[in-house]
């Protein structure tokens, strides 16, 4: 430095060019209501010189021929004087970079080092006026822990997307090293500051150390129990079975490892409370049990059930109530469970009974919910009569249906069965084959007595579905090889026969709720998406355009899945309230055997189920055979919008099929996704090769569809329909009342009590309703389809304009949904219960709304 420069430095003069930056972050005390002193401690560290530094990395000038040139460190200014209230959100800090007189070029990334003692959530860095360039924006959205926690530097890249081959040379090594850090080395227990994405089987569903009764099969890694992989945690193995992973004690269940950036990042406290409650619901069990002990384990009338919503029920005084008030905050009790904090439990009235308390019992509503309810993805067209089973007859004997022409002929509006089949008027809700293989073991439980069901329906002239017959089957008492013992029930509305028909429909609903929760919802959205989350972070750099496309659709998925494993799907969790009981996850593994990735596309699914046929003259290339099928009608519009958006996006970055084929990150991603993430399916011929732009478009469209619209359609109607459990019971405690039994005689005098005793046990009902109500809520910071959490998510203008078009398409779909819902001619859109179909309405407000399509499987 010259003498003049030394003098200037002493006098505080510095004529070197400066570049101003603006950093937006959230301090730990904003997002951690327990450790509210974190910001003060970090302020003291800052005062003592332990600051937060940033070094820019040139994206155009090499330092040593390989890596981009580094700027001198610059430090966040005024940390100590920035006093952020607990309720506040973002904090903004200035940072000033000395601009080297030598050519630095254009910054393409930066290294940040946190020398404080606590982590913070870094949202973005914006360089306001880079010489010869202008503004540069870095989207970060990541937790930055103290530097000593990391084995490598924390690096963030500017919001310019690059294919691997197009990455500027100075950034390539940084890009590669970041992916290496995210992959980890596959060893050791992972801690909260680790950023490692890796795979594991579902080997943490049981607790074999507590005894054989608490053991559960390992899902994944075998032909008997194939399953998608989950994120690895590296917890210690159990003592009883070294192949099983130990579990956290319940109070620590929120601490299960997921990469820190995958954890909930809610800003609003009530959203945090709701998330916490997902792991605290087990605390309610003792109080619920006490309540049920005081008023033995059943409701006596439908008025008792309605009182849960209209008046509330008093939880008994004692240690149980104290356990609730000690372990669950008053905000949760008041805002989420709607108690008064003094033990009065009250739930919001579900939509299905808001307008009419009894319309749910009608046959029309029973059929309508197969098209517009919470599980509208199972109904299929009947193509052979009687229905035949696909179960192996050498193992299970004759499993074909016993429904005959005589059961249905007089209900077909003058058509014969063959004529009804040929005219596409017969449909089936078929639970038989997925339930029957486990039913003998399920029914050995003291609390569960279920059937395997088939339901036949007729499509009427007004486009509603009329149930014709319900077949309920049990395993043959002499052994599986002897087939089934089946009985067929037909509609009736008076006397004991009418009550029996209501029972038959309820047994169908029990099957449907179990399959809905375990297969349609959990397996086919939550579980199958997690390997995509892991593979994307391991192999697609944040610079990669496909990472930028898919990343919003993975928000919070690993975290909610980890919570589900800890509190819902494990032994003693949610399975206690579903009819398959301890065999719940085993049933979902059986269903995964038939999972086919290309068939998750909505048009392919509708064709497979026979509810649509190919028709190139139709808007979506297929024609629905049930014109008033709200899920399919709205779903096809959403599907087409997603496909259009993905097509435009992919064409911008991939100019030819060769570009797809030679994308090293993309090919590594797809290879590992097939061979590791969905490793039990790796040899299936149906996997796309991902060699063309069309294959890339189709795969990304399916991924986004599953994570957004499919999940929304299957999840956010849960409380609307199943919040009133008589409509969608999850358990059946007894078999059908038979003539001569006490229950059959009681049907003559008090059929409602027998129904409730069979299908709505108090303890399980209270737990179920609590779970449904909490999990059906939208957070205040939810990001919906067609939205991004940052408007500057990419620098490329063409994708931004295409994304605006996507948002406009979704807005138009909202308007069409509202118009169709207002037309009474579309009977299935509201039905006898007058609940408009809004589950595929793209946007929503906060809370319990029964509408809205979040970008991701986030709850």
Swiss-Prot record:
Keyword Cytoplasm: yes
Alphabetical keyword list: Cytoplasm, Dioxygenase, Fatty acid biosynthesis, Fatty acid metabolism, Iron, Lipid biosynthesis, Lipid metabolism, Metal-binding, Oxidoreductase, Oxylipin biosynthesis
Annotated region (Disordered), positions in chain: 213-246
Biological-process GO terms, alphabetical: fatty acid biosynthetic process; lipid oxidation; oxylipin biosynthetic process
A GO molecular-function descriptor: metal ion binding
Recorded catalytic activity of this chain's protein: (9Z,12Z)-octadecadienoate + O2 = (9S)-hydroperoxy-(10E,12Z)-octadecadienoate
Tissue localization of expression: Fruit specific.
Any one Gene Ontology cellular component term annotated for this protein: cytoplasm
Domain Lipoxygenase stretches: 161-859
Residue ranges with Basic and acidic residues bias: 233-244
Role this protein plays: Plant lipoxygenase may be involved in a number of diverse aspects of plant physiology including growth and development, pest resistance, and senescence or responses to wounding. It catalyzes the hydroperoxidation of lipids containing a cis,cis-1,4-pentadiene structure.
Family listed: Belongs to the lipoxygenase family.
Protein name according to UniProt: Linoleate 9S-lipoxygenase B
Organism: Solanum lycopersicum (Tomato)
Lineage start: Eukaryota, Viridiplantae, Streptophyta, Embryophyta, Tracheophyta
